[in-house]
Curated annotation (Swiss-Prot):
Protein name (database record): KxDL motif-containing protein 1
UniProt keywords, alphabetically: Lysosome, Membrane
Function: As part of a BORC-like complex may play a role in lysosomes movement and localization at the cell periphery. Associated with the cytosolic face of lysosomes, this complex may couple lysosomes to microtubule plus-end-directed kinesin motor. May also be involved in the biogenesis of lysosome-related organelles such as melanosomes.
Primary localization class, coarse: membrane
UniProt record similarity statement: Belongs to the KXD1 family.
Pfam families in the cross-refs: KxDL
Keyword Membrane assigned: yes
BP GO annotations: lysosome localization; vesicle-mediated transport
C-alpha cells in the first residue's frame, strides 16, 4: 500500500511539473484568438447563407424568365414553320395552276438596309424554285435558285413580257384597274 501512495505521488508530481511548464497567458491568448476567429467565421457563414438565399431567389426568377422566353421562341418557331409550310403549299398550288406565269416571276433580293439598294441588282434577279424543289426541303426559309448556279437560267427581266409588270413585279388584276 505504501508503494501505491508513492506512485500516486510520483505521478502527481510529474503532472504538476508538466502543468507548470505551460504558460497560462499563452493559453488564454490562444483561446481568445480562437473565439475571435469563431465570431468572424459565424459572421462570414451568416453572410454566405444570406448570399446563397438571395442567389437562389434570383436564380429561380431568371430560370422562370428563361423558361418563358424559351417557350416563346419555340412557339414562334412553330408559327414560322407553319407560315413557311403554307407559303410552300401556296407556291405549289400556284405553280400547278399557272406554270408559265409562275416561272416568269422574279423575286428581288432581300435587302437588310434600304441604303444598300442597288437598282442594277434587278438584272441579276433570282427565280423562285419550282414546287417540287420547294416541297422537298424541310428548311423553313424560302427556296431560291441563284442565276449564277443554274445552267438553264434565262434572264427574263430583259425580255419583253406578255404580263404587265412594274419594276420586275407582276401586277395583280386590282393593281391593273387602279393603274388605268
Amino acid at each position: 500500500m505504501a508503494e501505491q501512495v508513492t506512485e500516486a505521488t510520483a505521478s502527481g508530481v510529474f503532472c504538476s511539473r508538466i502543468l507548470n511548464m505551460v504558460n497560462t497567458g499563452d493559453v488564454n491568448a490562444i483561446i481568445l484568438a480562437q473565439r475571435h476567429m469563431l465570431d468572424r467565421f459565424e459572421k462570414t457563414n451568416e453572410m454566405l447563407l444570406n448570399f446563397n438565399g438571395l442567389s437562389n431567389v434570383r436564380l429561380q426568377q431568371m430560370s422562370d424568365r428563361f423558361a418563358h422566353h424559351t417557350r416563346t421562341l419555340v412557339e414562334m418557331k412553330k408559327d414560322l414553320d407553319i407560315i413557311f409550310r403554307r407559303i410552300r403549299m401556296l407556291k405549289g398550288k400556284l405553280a400547278k395552276q399557272y406554270p408559265e406565269s409562275f416561272n416568269n416571276v422574279h423575286e428581288s433580293p432581300i435587302l437588310e438596309d434600304d441604303d444598300d439598294f442597288d437598282p442594277t441588282l434587278k438584272s441579276a434577279a433570282t427565280t423562285i424554285a419550282t414546287s417540287e424543289q420547294s416541297t422537298e426541303s424541310c428548311d423553313t426559309s424560302p427556296s431560291i435558285i441563284s442565276p449564277a448556279m443554274s445552267q438553264d437560267f434565262e434572264d427574263l427581266s430583259q425580255a419583253p413580257s406578255d404580263t404587265p409588270s412594274v419594276n420586275g413585279q407582276i401586277l395583280t388584276d386590282e393593281e391593273l384597274v387602279h393603274e388605268d
